[in-house]
Amino acid sequence: MDLNGECKGGDGFIDRSRVRILLCDNDSTSLGEVFTLLSECSYQVTAVKSARQVIDALNAEGPDIDIILAEIDLPMAKGMKMLRYITRDKDLRRIPVIMMSRQDEVPVVVKCLKLGAADYLVKPLRTNELLNLWTHMWRRRRMLGLAEKNMLSYDFDLVGSDQSDPNTNSTNLFSDDTDDRSLRSTNPQRGNLSHQENEWSVATAPVHARDGGLGADGTATSSLAVTAIEPPLDHLAGSHHEPMKRNSNPAQFSSAPKKSRLKIGESSAFFTYVKSTVLRTNGQDPPLVDGNGSLHLHRGLAEKFQVVASEGINNTKQARRATPKSTVLRTNGQDPPLVNGNGSHHLHRGAAEKFQVVASEGINNTKQAHRSRGTEQYHSQGETLQNGASYPHSLERSRTLPTSMESHGRNYQEGNMNIPQVAMNRSKDSSQVDGSGFSAPNAYPYYMHGVMNQVMMQSAAMMPQYGHQIPHCQPNHPNGMTGYPYYHHPMNTSLQHSQMSLQNGQMSMVHHSWSPAGNPPSNEVRVNKLDRREEALLKFRRKRNQRCFDKKIRYVNRKRLAERRPRVKGQFVRKMNGVNVDLNGQPDSADYDDEEEEEEEEEEENRDSSPQDDALGT
Protein backbone atom coordinates (compact mmCIF):
# COMPACT_ATOMS: atom_id res chain seq x y z
CA MET A 1 0.00 0.00 0.00
CA ASP A 2 1.47 3.31 -1.12
CA LEU A 3 0.40 5.65 1.62
CA ASN A 4 2.35 8.53 0.20
CA GLY A 5 0.56 8.26 -3.10
CA GLU A 6 -2.78 8.06 -1.37
CA CYS A 7 -2.07 11.05 0.82
CA LYS A 8 -0.85 13.04 -2.13
CA GLY A 9 -4.13 12.34 -3.85
CA GLY A 10 -5.96 14.22 -1.11
CA ASP A 11 -3.49 17.11 -0.91
CA GLY A 12 -5.32 18.75 -3.80
CA PHE A 13 -8.20 19.48 -1.43
CA ILE A 14 -6.93 19.15 2.16
CA ASP A 15 -3.54 20.28 3.42
CA ARG A 16 -2.91 18.06 6.44
CA SER A 17 0.58 19.48 6.91
CA ARG A 18 -1.01 22.42 8.72
CA VAL A 19 -2.35 20.14 11.47
CA ARG A 20 -0.07 19.39 14.41
CA ILE A 21 -0.71 16.25 16.49
CA LEU A 22 0.68 15.51 19.96
CA LEU A 23 1.24 11.73 20.15
CA CYS A 24 1.60 9.97 23.50
CA ASP A 25 2.36 6.25 23.94
CA ASN A 26 4.49 4.53 26.56
CA ASP A 27 5.23 1.60 24.21
CA SER A 28 8.19 2.46 21.98
CA THR A 29 7.18 0.01 19.23
CA SER A 30 3.61 1.23 19.02
CA LEU A 31 4.79 4.82 19.26
CA GLY A 32 7.07 4.35 16.26
CA GLU A 33 4.38 2.70 14.14
CA VAL A 34 1.78 5.37 14.79
CA PHE A 35 4.37 8.12 14.31
CA THR A 36 5.26 6.68 10.88
CA LEU A 37 1.63 6.47 9.78
CA LEU A 38 0.90 10.04 10.85
CA SER A 39 4.00 11.34 9.10
CA GLU A 40 3.08 9.56 5.87
CA CYS A 41 -0.31 11.28 6.05
CA SER A 42 1.51 14.66 6.10
CA TYR A 43 0.66 15.51 9.72
CA GLN A 44 3.11 17.36 11.96
CA VAL A 45 3.76 15.00 14.88
CA THR A 46 5.25 15.58 18.33
CA ALA A 47 5.87 12.30 20.21
CA VAL A 48 6.02 11.88 23.99
CA LYS A 49 5.91 8.83 26.29
CA SER A 50 4.13 9.89 29.48
CA ALA A 51 1.22 11.95 30.71
CA ARG A 52 3.61 14.39 32.43
CA GLN A 53 5.36 15.07 29.13
CA VAL A 54 1.97 15.75 27.52
CA ILE A 55 1.19 18.44 30.09
CA ASP A 56 4.64 19.94 29.67
CA ALA A 57 4.26 20.05 25.88
CA LEU A 58 0.87 21.72 26.22
CA ASN A 59 2.29 24.34 28.55
CA ALA A 60 5.15 25.05 26.15
CA GLU A 61 3.46 24.77 22.74
CA GLY A 62 -0.23 24.83 23.56
CA PRO A 63 -1.38 27.27 20.85
CA ASP A 64 0.36 25.26 18.10
CA ILE A 65 -1.08 21.84 19.00
CA ASP A 66 -4.32 20.96 17.25
CA ILE A 67 -5.01 17.31 18.22
CA ILE A 68 -3.89 14.99 21.04
CA LEU A 69 -3.66 11.28 20.23
CA ALA A 70 -2.86 9.41 23.44
CA GLU A 71 -2.72 5.82 24.66
CA ILE A 72 -5.14 5.17 27.49
CA ASP A 73 -2.91 2.68 29.31
CA LEU A 74 -0.18 4.99 30.58
CA PRO A 75 -1.20 3.23 32.96
CA MET A 76 -4.94 3.67 32.74
CA ALA A 77 -5.30 5.74 35.88
CA LYS A 78 -2.86 8.33 34.58
CA GLY A 79 -4.45 8.28 31.14
CA MET A 80 -7.89 9.00 32.60
CA LYS A 81 -6.48 11.71 34.83
CA MET A 82 -4.76 13.38 31.89
CA LEU A 83 -7.98 13.25 29.85
CA ARG A 84 -9.97 14.80 32.68
CA TYR A 85 -7.41 17.57 33.15
CA ILE A 86 -7.34 18.59 29.47
CA THR A 87 -11.11 18.56 28.94
CA ARG A 88 -11.77 20.65 32.06
CA ASP A 89 -9.14 23.31 31.36
CA LYS A 90 -10.61 26.40 29.71
CA ASP A 91 -7.56 27.06 27.56
CA LEU A 92 -7.03 23.43 26.51
CA ARG A 93 -10.56 22.27 25.87
CA ARG A 94 -10.30 23.54 22.30
CA ILE A 95 -7.94 20.61 21.61
CA PRO A 96 -9.77 17.35 20.87
CA VAL A 97 -8.34 14.37 22.75
CA ILE A 98 -8.50 11.05 20.90
CA MET A 99 -7.79 7.96 22.99
CA MET A 100 -6.41 4.75 21.52
CA SER A 101 -5.90 1.29 22.98
CA ARG A 102 -5.81 -2.39 22.17
CA GLN A 103 -8.72 -2.95 24.56
CA ASP A 104 -11.97 -3.04 22.68
CA GLU A 105 -14.23 -2.99 25.72
CA VAL A 106 -17.47 -1.08 25.92
CA PRO A 107 -17.09 0.11 29.55
CA VAL A 108 -13.70 1.63 28.79
CA VAL A 109 -15.01 3.37 25.67
CA VAL A 110 -18.03 4.75 27.51
CA LYS A 111 -15.88 6.04 30.34
CA CYS A 112 -13.56 7.87 27.94
CA LEU A 113 -16.45 9.45 26.08
CA LYS A 114 -18.05 10.57 29.34
CA LEU A 115 -14.81 12.28 30.35
CA GLY A 116 -14.80 14.26 27.10
CA ALA A 117 -12.79 12.23 24.60
CA ALA A 118 -13.53 13.13 20.99
CA ASP A 119 -13.05 9.56 19.72
CA TYR A 120 -11.77 6.13 20.69
CA LEU A 121 -9.57 4.17 18.29
CA VAL A 122 -8.69 0.50 18.58
CA LYS A 123 -5.19 -0.63 17.67
CA PRO A 124 -3.87 -1.43 15.16
CA LEU A 125 -4.83 1.90 13.68
CA ARG A 126 -6.12 2.12 10.12
CA THR A 127 -5.22 4.68 7.51
CA ASN A 128 -8.80 5.91 7.14
CA GLU A 129 -8.98 6.79 10.81
CA LEU A 130 -5.73 8.76 10.70
CA LEU A 131 -6.67 10.60 7.53
CA ASN A 132 -9.86 11.80 9.21
CA LEU A 133 -8.30 13.09 12.42
CA TRP A 134 -8.38 16.67 11.19
CA THR A 135 -12.20 16.64 11.16
CA HIS A 136 -12.24 16.44 14.97
CA MET A 137 -10.21 19.65 15.14
CA TRP A 138 -12.55 21.33 12.68
CA ARG A 139 -15.64 20.32 14.66
CA ARG A 140 -14.22 21.50 17.97
CA ARG A 141 -13.20 24.89 16.61
CA ARG A 142 -16.52 25.24 14.88
CA MET A 143 -18.41 24.37 18.05
CA LEU A 144 -16.48 26.87 20.17
CA GLY A 145 -16.66 29.60 17.54
CA LEU A 146 -12.90 29.89 17.11
CA ALA A 147 -10.98 30.83 14.01
CA GLU A 148 -10.20 27.97 11.68
CA LYS A 149 -7.06 26.94 9.92
CA ASN A 150 -7.04 27.33 6.17
CA MET A 151 -6.76 23.64 5.34
CA LEU A 152 -8.77 23.61 2.11
CA SER A 153 -6.48 24.34 -0.79
CA TYR A 154 -9.20 24.79 -3.41
CA ASP A 155 -12.86 25.64 -3.49
CA PHE A 156 -14.99 22.68 -4.38
CA ASP A 157 -18.60 21.80 -5.01
CA LEU A 158 -20.53 19.34 -2.88
CA VAL A 159 -21.39 15.91 -4.19
CA GLY A 160 -24.01 14.44 -1.87
CA SER A 161 -23.14 10.84 -1.08
CA ASP A 162 -25.72 8.12 -0.87
CA GLN A 163 -26.49 6.92 2.65
CA SER A 164 -26.40 3.32 1.47
CA ASP A 165 -22.94 3.77 -0.05
CA PRO A 166 -20.41 1.71 1.93
CA ASN A 167 -17.98 4.63 1.80
CA THR A 168 -20.34 6.90 3.71
CA ASN A 169 -19.58 6.27 7.37
CA SER A 170 -17.85 7.91 10.26
CA THR A 171 -14.43 6.36 9.58
CA ASN A 172 -13.77 7.20 5.94
CA LEU A 173 -15.08 10.73 5.46
CA PHE A 174 -12.74 12.71 3.23
CA SER A 175 -10.33 9.78 3.14
CA ASP A 176 -8.31 9.13 0.04
CA ASP A 177 -8.04 5.34 0.04
CA THR A 178 -11.75 4.70 -0.33
CA ASP A 179 -13.57 3.80 -3.49
CA ASP A 180 -14.39 7.34 -4.50
CA ARG A 181 -17.28 6.62 -6.81
CA SER A 182 -19.07 9.84 -7.61
CA LEU A 183 -22.80 9.98 -8.00
CA ARG A 184 -22.27 11.39 -11.47
CA SER A 185 -21.78 7.88 -12.79
CA THR A 186 -25.20 6.77 -11.54
CA ASN A 187 -27.03 10.01 -12.26
CA PRO A 188 -25.78 11.67 -15.46
CA GLN A 189 -28.36 14.41 -15.20
CA ARG A 190 -26.72 15.83 -12.08
CA GLY A 191 -24.03 17.50 -14.13
CA ASN A 192 -26.63 19.50 -16.06
CA LEU A 193 -27.88 21.33 -12.98
CA SER A 194 -27.81 25.07 -13.21
CA HIS A 195 -25.42 27.20 -11.22
CA GLN A 196 -28.35 28.85 -9.49
CA GLU A 197 -29.61 25.56 -8.05
CA ASN A 198 -26.23 24.86 -6.47
CA GLU A 199 -26.19 28.22 -4.67
CA TRP A 200 -29.59 27.98 -3.06
CA SER A 201 -29.57 28.87 0.60
CA VAL A 202 -30.96 26.58 3.27
CA ALA A 203 -32.18 29.42 5.47
CA THR A 204 -33.99 31.39 2.74
CA ALA A 205 -34.89 29.15 -0.18
CA PRO A 206 -37.29 26.21 0.34
CA VAL A 207 -36.87 22.90 -1.41
CA HIS A 208 -39.15 23.05 -4.44
CA ALA A 209 -40.79 19.92 -5.69
CA ARG A 210 -40.21 20.96 -9.30
CA ASP A 211 -36.51 20.16 -8.92
CA GLY A 212 -37.40 16.50 -9.04
CA GLY A 213 -39.08 16.60 -12.42
CA LEU A 214 -38.47 14.48 -15.46
CA GLY A 215 -35.87 14.96 -18.08
CA ALA A 216 -36.26 14.31 -21.74
CA ASP A 217 -35.52 10.63 -21.31
CA GLY A 218 -37.78 10.18 -18.30
CA THR A 219 -34.99 9.97 -15.71
CA ALA A 220 -35.07 11.84 -12.43
CA THR A 221 -33.19 15.14 -12.30
CA SER A 222 -33.77 16.06 -8.68
CA SER A 223 -30.89 17.94 -7.11
CA LEU A 224 -29.90 17.55 -3.48
CA ALA A 225 -30.00 21.04 -2.10
CA VAL A 226 -26.78 20.79 -0.15
CA THR A 227 -25.02 23.83 1.23
CA ALA A 228 -22.00 24.05 3.44
CA ILE A 229 -21.63 26.01 6.62
CA GLU A 230 -18.28 27.40 5.64
CA PRO A 231 -16.96 30.85 6.63
CA PRO A 232 -14.95 32.95 4.19
CA LEU A 233 -11.54 31.40 3.82
CA ASP A 234 -9.81 34.64 2.91
CA HIS A 235 -10.14 36.14 6.39
CA LEU A 236 -8.72 33.43 8.63
CA ALA A 237 -5.38 35.02 9.38
CA GLY A 238 -4.69 35.70 13.01
CA SER A 239 -4.41 33.93 16.33
CA HIS A 240 -6.01 30.55 16.88
CA HIS A 241 -7.70 31.76 20.06
CA GLU A 242 -9.30 34.81 18.46
CA PRO A 243 -13.06 34.36 18.44
CA MET A 244 -14.62 34.45 15.02
CA LYS A 245 -17.71 36.50 14.31
CA ARG A 246 -20.33 34.20 12.84
CA ASN A 247 -21.81 35.05 9.50
CA SER A 248 -25.37 36.28 9.56
CA ASN A 249 -26.25 33.82 6.80
CA PRO A 250 -23.96 30.85 7.39
CA ALA A 251 -25.65 28.62 4.82
CA GLN A 252 -23.88 30.08 1.77
CA PHE A 253 -20.53 29.76 0.04
CA SER A 254 -18.08 32.61 0.04
CA SER A 255 -17.11 32.01 -3.57
CA ALA A 256 -18.46 30.34 -6.64
CA PRO A 257 -18.24 26.55 -6.23
CA LYS A 258 -16.26 24.38 -8.57
CA LYS A 259 -17.01 20.83 -9.61
CA SER A 260 -14.89 18.13 -8.06
CA ARG A 261 -14.97 14.47 -7.13
CA LEU A 262 -14.71 14.97 -3.37
CA LYS A 263 -17.29 12.87 -1.53
CA ILE A 264 -18.86 14.45 1.53
CA GLY A 265 -20.48 11.98 3.94
CA GLU A 266 -23.75 12.92 5.54
CA SER A 267 -22.77 11.60 8.94
CA SER A 268 -19.97 14.20 9.22
CA ALA A 269 -20.47 17.47 11.04
CA PHE A 270 -18.40 19.24 8.38
CA PHE A 271 -21.42 20.13 6.30
CA THR A 272 -25.10 20.69 6.94
CA TYR A 273 -27.33 18.68 4.70
CA VAL A 274 -30.81 19.46 3.59
CA LYS A 275 -32.70 16.19 3.64
CA SER A 276 -35.12 15.77 0.82
CA THR A 277 -38.71 15.78 1.99
CA VAL A 278 -39.94 14.02 -1.15
CA LEU A 279 -40.39 10.30 -0.54
CA ARG A 280 -39.21 7.93 -3.24
CA THR A 281 -40.93 4.65 -4.00
CA ASN A 282 -39.42 1.88 -6.13
CA GLY A 283 -36.69 4.09 -7.50
CA GLN A 284 -39.14 6.62 -8.98
CA ASP A 285 -39.95 10.17 -7.96
CA PRO A 286 -43.45 10.63 -6.53
CA PRO A 287 -46.10 12.69 -8.30
CA LEU A 288 -45.38 16.40 -8.18
CA VAL A 289 -47.88 19.21 -7.87
CA ASP A 290 -47.03 22.55 -9.46
CA GLY A 291 -48.43 25.95 -8.69
CA ASN A 292 -51.55 25.72 -10.86
CA GLY A 293 -52.78 22.53 -9.18
CA SER A 294 -51.73 20.07 -11.87
CA LEU A 295 -50.36 16.66 -10.95
CA HIS A 296 -47.30 15.37 -12.81
CA LEU A 297 -46.72 11.64 -12.99
CA HIS A 298 -43.75 9.73 -14.34
CA ARG A 299 -44.07 7.60 -17.42
CA GLY A 300 -44.00 4.29 -15.51
CA LEU A 301 -46.38 5.47 -12.82
CA ALA A 302 -48.76 6.89 -15.39
CA GLU A 303 -48.85 3.56 -17.26
CA LYS A 304 -49.67 1.71 -14.03
CA PHE A 305 -52.34 4.30 -13.33
CA GLN A 306 -53.94 3.75 -16.72
CA VAL A 307 -53.93 -0.03 -16.28
CA VAL A 308 -55.56 0.16 -12.86
CA ALA A 309 -58.04 2.76 -13.99
CA SER A 310 -58.97 0.78 -17.11
CA GLU A 311 -59.66 -2.29 -14.97
CA GLY A 312 -62.02 -0.30 -12.80
CA ILE A 313 -63.76 1.22 -15.82
CA ASN A 314 -64.11 -2.10 -17.65
CA ASN A 315 -65.59 -3.76 -14.58
CA THR A 316 -68.13 -1.03 -13.95
CA LYS A 317 -69.04 0.38 -17.35
CA GLN A 318 -71.83 -2.18 -17.74
CA ALA A 319 -73.39 -0.78 -14.62
CA ARG A 320 -73.10 2.75 -15.99
CA ARG A 321 -74.79 2.35 -19.39
CA ALA A 322 -77.12 5.17 -18.57
CA THR A 323 -74.25 7.45 -19.59
CA PRO A 324 -73.82 7.57 -23.42
CA LYS A 325 -70.03 7.34 -23.35
CA SER A 326 -67.71 5.95 -20.68
CA THR A 327 -65.03 8.57 -20.37
CA VAL A 328 -61.89 7.68 -18.46
CA LEU A 329 -61.66 9.61 -15.22
CA ARG A 330 -64.01 12.37 -16.35
CA THR A 331 -65.07 14.31 -13.28
CA ASN A 332 -67.68 17.04 -12.90
CA GLY A 333 -66.80 19.67 -15.44
CA GLN A 334 -63.14 18.64 -15.72
CA ASP A 335 -61.05 17.40 -18.60
CA PRO A 336 -59.37 13.99 -18.80
CA PRO A 337 -55.64 13.63 -18.18
CA LEU A 338 -53.33 15.27 -20.69
CA VAL A 339 -50.02 13.93 -21.96
CA ASN A 340 -47.26 16.40 -22.79
CA GLY A 341 -44.18 15.94 -24.91
CA ASN A 342 -41.90 14.55 -22.26
CA GLY A 343 -44.23 11.69 -21.33
CA SER A 344 -45.61 13.21 -18.13
CA HIS A 345 -49.32 12.94 -17.39
CA HIS A 346 -51.05 16.00 -15.98
CA LEU A 347 -54.09 15.50 -13.78
CA HIS A 348 -56.21 18.25 -12.35
CA ARG A 349 -56.47 18.44 -8.62
CA GLY A 350 -60.01 16.99 -8.59
CA ALA A 351 -59.00 14.05 -10.75
CA ALA A 352 -55.94 13.47 -8.62
CA GLU A 353 -58.09 13.22 -5.53
CA LYS A 354 -60.24 10.54 -7.18
CA PHE A 355 -57.24 8.54 -8.36
CA GLN A 356 -57.22 6.32 -5.29
CA VAL A 357 -60.98 5.77 -5.46
CA VAL A 358 -60.86 4.51 -9.05
CA ALA A 359 -57.76 2.41 -8.39
CA SER A 360 -59.37 0.73 -5.40
CA GLU A 361 -62.43 0.01 -7.53
CA GLY A 362 -60.27 -1.78 -10.10
CA ILE A 363 -58.38 -3.80 -7.51
CA ASN A 364 -61.48 -4.92 -5.63
CA ASN A 365 -63.18 -5.90 -8.93
CA THR A 366 -66.24 -3.79 -8.22
CA LYS A 367 -67.33 -5.30 -4.94
CA GLN A 368 -70.43 -3.14 -5.00
CA ALA A 369 -71.61 -1.87 -8.41
CA HIS A 370 -73.63 1.29 -8.66
CA ARG A 371 -77.16 -0.11 -8.68
CA SER A 372 -78.80 3.15 -9.60
CA ARG A 373 -77.69 6.53 -10.94
CA GLY A 374 -80.79 8.30 -9.62
CA THR A 375 -84.48 7.91 -9.07
CA GLU A 376 -85.26 7.93 -12.83
CA GLN A 377 -82.75 5.41 -14.25
CA TYR A 378 -82.67 1.67 -13.54
CA HIS A 379 -80.81 -1.33 -14.83
CA SER A 380 -82.66 -3.62 -17.21
CA GLN A 381 -82.81 -7.39 -16.83
CA GLY A 382 -80.49 -7.98 -19.77
CA GLU A 383 -77.54 -6.11 -18.24
CA THR A 384 -74.58 -8.23 -17.29
CA LEU A 385 -71.53 -7.69 -15.15
CA GLN A 386 -68.11 -8.65 -16.45
CA ASN A 387 -67.01 -10.18 -13.17
CA GLY A 388 -69.97 -11.74 -11.37
CA ALA A 389 -68.67 -11.41 -7.85
CA SER A 390 -70.58 -13.46 -5.32
CA TYR A 391 -72.23 -11.07 -2.93
CA PRO A 392 -72.67 -11.92 0.76
CA HIS A 393 -76.09 -12.67 2.15
CA SER A 394 -76.26 -9.30 3.86
CA LEU A 395 -76.33 -6.50 1.27
CA GLU A 396 -75.34 -3.01 2.13
CA ARG A 397 -78.08 -0.48 1.95
CA SER A 398 -78.10 1.53 -1.24
CA ARG A 399 -77.67 5.25 -1.01
CA THR A 400 -80.53 5.94 -3.47
CA LEU A 401 -83.81 4.17 -2.90
CA PRO A 402 -86.08 3.32 -5.84
CA THR A 403 -89.13 5.41 -6.51
CA SER A 404 -91.49 2.86 -5.01
CA MET A 405 -89.45 2.66 -1.81
CA GLU A 406 -89.38 6.43 -1.51
CA SER A 407 -93.15 6.51 -1.85
CA HIS A 408 -93.43 3.86 0.83
CA GLY A 409 -91.29 5.98 3.13
CA ARG A 410 -93.47 9.01 2.51
CA ASN A 411 -96.66 7.05 3.05
CA TYR A 412 -95.34 5.65 6.30
CA GLN A 413 -94.59 9.11 7.55
CA GLU A 414 -98.18 10.11 6.73
CA GLY A 415 -99.50 7.34 8.97
CA ASN A 416 -100.17 4.53 6.50
CA MET A 417 -98.60 1.16 7.08
CA ASN A 418 -96.84 -0.19 4.00
CA ILE A 419 -94.97 -3.43 3.53
CA PRO A 420 -91.66 -3.29 1.61
CA GLN A 421 -92.24 -4.68 -1.85
CA VAL A 422 -90.25 -7.42 -3.49
CA ALA A 423 -90.75 -7.54 -7.24
CA MET A 424 -91.08 -11.18 -8.30
CA ASN A 425 -90.55 -10.93 -12.03
CA ARG A 426 -90.49 -14.32 -13.69
CA SER A 427 -90.26 -12.85 -17.16
CA LYS A 428 -90.36 -9.54 -18.91
CA ASP A 429 -94.06 -10.00 -19.69
CA SER A 430 -95.01 -10.26 -16.01
CA SER A 431 -93.29 -7.03 -15.07
CA GLN A 432 -95.49 -4.62 -13.15
CA VAL A 433 -95.72 -1.15 -14.60
CA ASP A 434 -96.55 1.70 -12.31
CA GLY A 435 -98.30 4.93 -13.13
CA SER A 436 -95.14 6.77 -14.15
CA GLY A 437 -94.35 4.40 -16.99
CA PHE A 438 -91.16 2.93 -15.55
CA SER A 439 -90.77 -0.80 -15.28
CA ALA A 440 -90.51 -2.06 -11.72
CA PRO A 441 -86.90 -3.05 -10.98
CA ASN A 442 -85.66 -6.17 -9.27
CA ALA A 443 -85.74 -4.61 -5.84
CA TYR A 444 -83.18 -5.72 -3.32
CA PRO A 445 -84.28 -6.28 0.28
CA TYR A 446 -84.45 -2.85 1.81
CA TYR A 447 -85.06 -2.60 5.52
CA MET A 448 -86.85 0.55 6.55
CA HIS A 449 -86.57 1.69 10.11
CA GLY A 450 -89.84 1.66 12.04
CA VAL A 451 -92.03 -0.14 9.49
CA MET A 452 -92.08 -3.52 11.19
CA ASN A 453 -89.82 -6.05 12.80
CA GLN A 454 -87.68 -6.99 9.84
CA VAL A 455 -85.37 -9.68 11.17
CA MET A 456 -83.08 -11.62 8.84
CA MET A 457 -83.86 -15.25 9.63
CA GLN A 458 -81.30 -17.98 9.07
CA SER A 459 -83.85 -20.62 8.07
CA ALA A 460 -87.57 -21.21 7.89
CA ALA A 461 -87.44 -23.46 10.95
CA MET A 462 -86.58 -20.48 13.15
CA MET A 463 -90.29 -19.54 13.40
CA PRO A 464 -92.18 -22.78 14.13
CA GLN A 465 -94.99 -21.05 15.98
CA TYR A 466 -96.54 -19.80 12.75
CA GLY A 467 -97.20 -23.32 11.49
CA HIS A 468 -95.61 -22.91 8.07
CA GLN A 469 -92.27 -22.46 6.39
CA ILE A 470 -91.46 -19.24 4.65
CA PRO A 471 -89.85 -20.04 1.30
CA HIS A 472 -86.72 -18.47 -0.06
CA CYS A 473 -87.59 -16.31 -3.01
CA GLN A 474 -85.69 -16.97 -6.19
CA PRO A 475 -86.33 -13.97 -8.44
CA ASN A 476 -84.76 -13.40 -11.81
CA HIS A 477 -81.34 -11.79 -11.54
CA PRO A 478 -78.98 -10.36 -14.13
CA ASN A 479 -76.73 -12.88 -15.79
CA GLY A 480 -73.64 -13.68 -13.78
CA MET A 481 -75.13 -12.65 -10.45
CA THR A 482 -76.09 -15.11 -7.78
CA GLY A 483 -79.49 -15.05 -6.15
CA TYR A 484 -80.12 -13.40 -2.84
CA PRO A 485 -82.21 -14.99 -0.08
CA TYR A 486 -85.34 -12.91 0.41
CA TYR A 487 -86.98 -13.04 3.82
CA HIS A 488 -90.40 -11.73 4.68
CA HIS A 489 -91.88 -11.02 8.07
CA PRO A 490 -94.08 -14.02 9.07
CA MET A 491 -97.34 -12.14 9.41
CA ASN A 492 -98.92 -13.58 6.26
CA THR A 493 -99.50 -17.33 6.57
CA SER A 494 -100.31 -17.95 2.90
CA LEU A 495 -97.75 -18.67 0.21
CA GLN A 496 -98.48 -15.37 -1.43
CA HIS A 497 -96.60 -12.16 -0.92
CA SER A 498 -98.66 -9.02 -0.80
CA GLN A 499 -97.11 -6.21 -2.74
CA MET A 500 -98.76 -3.04 -1.60
CA SER A 501 -98.59 0.25 -3.38
CA LEU A 502 -100.40 3.49 -2.86
CA GLN A 503 -102.12 4.83 -5.96
CA ASN A 504 -104.48 7.82 -5.90
CA GLY A 505 -104.65 7.71 -2.11
CA GLN A 506 -105.96 4.12 -2.00
CA MET A 507 -104.18 0.91 -1.08
CA SER A 508 -104.28 -1.84 -3.69
CA MET A 509 -103.04 -5.40 -3.26
CA VAL A 510 -101.11 -7.09 -6.07
CA HIS A 511 -100.62 -10.77 -5.38
CA HIS A 512 -97.74 -12.79 -6.70
CA SER A 513 -97.84 -16.53 -6.28
CA TRP A 514 -94.63 -18.05 -5.02
CA SER A 515 -93.42 -21.38 -6.20
CA PRO A 516 -92.30 -23.77 -3.46
CA ALA A 517 -89.51 -25.04 -5.70
CA GLY A 518 -86.95 -22.96 -3.85
CA ASN A 519 -87.70 -24.37 -0.41
CA PRO A 520 -84.68 -25.93 1.26
CA PRO A 521 -85.07 -29.58 2.40
CA SER A 522 -85.91 -30.04 6.07
CA ASN A 523 -82.92 -32.33 6.71
CA GLU A 524 -80.55 -29.47 5.88
CA VAL A 525 -81.88 -27.25 8.66
CA ARG A 526 -79.00 -26.34 10.89
CA VAL A 527 -79.05 -26.82 14.62
CA ASN A 528 -79.91 -23.62 16.38
CA LYS A 529 -77.60 -21.90 18.76
CA LEU A 530 -79.26 -23.24 21.91
CA ASP A 531 -78.95 -26.85 20.82
CA ARG A 532 -75.31 -26.40 19.94
CA ARG A 533 -74.56 -24.89 23.31
CA GLU A 534 -76.40 -27.68 25.12
CA GLU A 535 -74.56 -30.33 23.15
CA ALA A 536 -71.21 -28.72 23.86
CA LEU A 537 -72.04 -28.49 27.56
CA LEU A 538 -72.92 -32.19 27.72
CA LYS A 539 -69.74 -33.11 25.93
CA PHE A 540 -67.71 -31.03 28.35
CA ARG A 541 -69.35 -32.66 31.35
CA ARG A 542 -68.70 -36.13 29.99
CA LYS A 543 -65.06 -35.35 29.54
CA ARG A 544 -64.85 -33.89 33.02
CA ASN A 545 -66.44 -36.98 34.54
CA GLN A 546 -64.01 -39.19 32.67
CA ARG A 547 -61.11 -37.18 33.99
CA CYS A 548 -62.41 -37.43 37.53
CA PHE A 549 -62.96 -41.17 37.08
CA ASP A 550 -59.35 -41.64 36.05
CA LYS A 551 -58.19 -39.75 39.10
CA LYS A 552 -60.32 -41.88 41.40
CA ILE A 553 -59.03 -45.09 39.85
CA ARG A 554 -55.47 -43.94 40.38
CA TYR A 555 -56.21 -43.09 43.99
CA VAL A 556 -57.84 -46.48 44.65
CA ASN A 557 -54.89 -48.32 43.17
CA ARG A 558 -52.50 -46.41 45.36
CA LYS A 559 -54.60 -47.07 48.41
CA ARG A 560 -54.72 -50.77 47.62
CA LEU A 561 -50.95 -50.96 47.27
CA ALA A 562 -50.44 -49.06 50.50
CA GLU A 563 -52.76 -51.28 52.46
CA ARG A 564 -51.23 -54.46 51.10
CA ARG A 565 -47.91 -53.36 52.58
CA PRO A 566 -48.85 -52.43 56.14
CA ARG A 567 -46.20 -50.90 58.32
CA VAL A 568 -45.85 -49.05 61.54
CA LYS A 569 -44.45 -45.57 61.50
CA GLY A 570 -40.68 -45.80 61.71
CA GLN A 571 -40.55 -49.61 61.41
CA PHE A 572 -40.55 -52.20 58.66
CA VAL A 573 -42.90 -55.15 58.38
CA ARG A 574 -41.54 -58.10 60.30
CA LYS A 575 -41.67 -61.60 58.90
CA MET A 576 -42.12 -64.66 61.17
CA ASN A 577 -41.48 -68.01 59.53
CA GLY A 578 -41.95 -66.52 56.05
CA VAL A 579 -45.44 -65.18 56.82
CA ASN A 580 -46.26 -61.48 56.76
CA VAL A 581 -47.43 -60.17 60.10
CA ASP A 582 -50.29 -57.70 59.70
CA LEU A 583 -49.81 -55.14 62.46
CA ASN A 584 -52.78 -53.04 61.38
CA GLY A 585 -55.41 -55.75 61.81
CA GLN A 586 -56.56 -55.55 58.16
CA PRO A 587 -58.41 -58.55 56.64
CA ASP A 588 -56.89 -60.91 54.13
CA SER A 589 -56.27 -59.77 50.61
CA ALA A 590 -59.04 -61.98 49.14
CA ASP A 591 -61.69 -60.50 51.38
CA TYR A 592 -60.34 -57.04 50.69
CA ASP A 593 -60.63 -57.53 46.96
CA ASP A 594 -64.31 -58.41 47.23
CA GLU A 595 -65.04 -55.38 49.35
CA GLU A 596 -63.04 -53.21 46.96
CA GLU A 597 -65.13 -54.33 44.00
CA GLU A 598 -68.34 -53.52 45.87
CA GLU A 599 -67.03 -50.07 46.73
CA GLU A 600 -66.14 -49.41 43.11
CA GLU A 601 -69.63 -50.38 41.96
CA GLU A 602 -71.17 -48.03 44.50
CA GLU A 603 -68.92 -45.20 43.36
CA GLU A 604 -69.90 -45.74 39.74
CA GLU A 605 -73.59 -45.62 40.63
CA ASN A 606 -73.07 -42.43 42.58
CA ARG A 607 -71.25 -40.92 39.63
CA ASP A 608 -74.00 -41.79 37.21
CA SER A 609 -76.52 -39.98 39.39
CA SER A 610 -74.39 -36.96 40.20
CA PRO A 611 -76.06 -33.65 41.22
CA GLN A 612 -74.83 -32.01 38.02
CA ASP A 613 -76.64 -34.54 35.84
CA ASP A 614 -79.77 -34.24 37.98
CA ALA A 615 -79.76 -30.49 37.56
CA LEU A 616 -79.31 -30.86 33.81
CA GLY A 617 -82.20 -33.33 33.57
CA THR A 618 -84.55 -30.98 35.37
From Swiss-Prot:
> Which species is listed as the source?
Arabidopsis thaliana
**Reported induction:** Expressed with a circadian rhythm showing a broad peak in the late day and early night. Negatively regulated by LHY and CCA1.
Q: What is this protein called?
A: Two-component response regulator-like APRR1
**Keyword check for Transferase:** no
Locate the region Disordered. 161-200, 239-260, 316-338, 368-395, 573-618
Instruction: Please classify the protein's predominant subcellular localization into one broad category.
Output: nucleus
The keyword Cell inner membrane is annotated on this UniProt entry = no
Q: How is it modified after translation?
A: Phosphorylated; during the day. Phosphorylation is required for optimal interaction with APRR3.
Where is the sequence biased in composition, kind Acidic residues?
590-606
- Where do the CCT domain residues begin and end? 533-575
Ranges of biased composition (kind: Polar residues): 161-174, 187-200, 246-257, 324-334, 375-389
